[in-house]
C-alpha cells in the first residue's frame, strides 16, 4: 500500500485531532468519554460536535414562529450545557476540547466540520433508532464516506 492509496497520514502513532459527535443519548456520552480517554493517552485534542437536526416542516402556519423560537432556545440551552460538560471533562483530564454546535443534517455537518478541523478520527455512539436499520445510521454513513477512521461506541 503506497501513501497515494488513501488520505490517511502514515508514520504517526495515532490521531492528533479526534472529532466526537455528541447529543444527549447514553451512547453519545459513552462515545465522549471514550474519545476523551483516547485523546488523553494519545496527546490529541478533541473537537466535540453537537448537531441539531433541522425539521423542514411545522414552521409555517399558526404558532410556527413561536415553535421556531422554542426550538432555537432548546438548541441553545442544550448546546450550552454540552459545552460546559466538555469544558469540565477537558479540565479534569487535562485535554484540549473545542465544542462546536451546529444545525442541519448531522452527517453533512460532521463531515464539513471534520474537514475544517482536519480530524484524524471520528468517534460516535451507536444509534438506538430502529429506523436506522433501513436507512443507515450516522455511523454507517460516516464509514461509507471513506475519509476518516470511525469508532462506534455501543
Where are these regions (language model features)?
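Small/aliphatic-rich secondary-structure junction motif
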Residues: 7-65
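Short, hinge-like loop/turn segments at secondary-structure boundaries
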Residues: 63-67, 116-118, 140-141
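Short glycine/serine/threonine/alanine-rich loop segments
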Residues: 44-45, 95, 119, 148
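A short acidic, glycine-rich active-site loop
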Residues: 66-81
Amino acid at each position: 500500500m503506497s501513501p497515494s492509496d488513501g488520505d490517511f497520514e502514515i508514520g504517526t502513532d495515532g490521531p492528533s485531532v479526534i472529532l466526537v459527535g455528541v447529543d444527549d443519548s447514553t451512547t453519545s456520552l459513552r462515545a465522549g468519554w471514550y474519545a476523551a480517554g483516547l485523546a488523553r493517552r494519545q496527546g490529541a485534542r478533541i473537537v466535540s460536535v453537537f448537531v441539531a437536526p433541522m425539521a423542514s416542516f411545522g414552521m409555517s402556519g399558526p404558532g410556527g414562529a413561536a415553535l421556531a423560537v422554542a426550538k432555537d432556545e432548546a438548541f441553545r440551552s442544550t448546546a450550552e450545557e454540552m459545552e460546559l460538560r466538555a469544558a469540565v471533562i477537558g479540565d479534569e483530564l487535562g485535554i484540549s476540547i473545542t465544542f462546536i454546535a451546529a444545525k442541519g443534517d448531522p452527517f453533512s455537518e460532521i463531515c464539513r466540520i471534520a474537514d475544517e478541523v482536519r480530524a484524524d478520527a471520528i468517534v460516535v455512539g451507536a444509534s438506538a433508532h430502529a429506523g436506522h436499520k433501513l436507512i443507515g445510521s450516522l455511523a454507517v454513513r460516516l464509514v461509507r464516506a471513506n475519509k476518516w477512521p470511525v469508532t462506534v461506541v455501543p
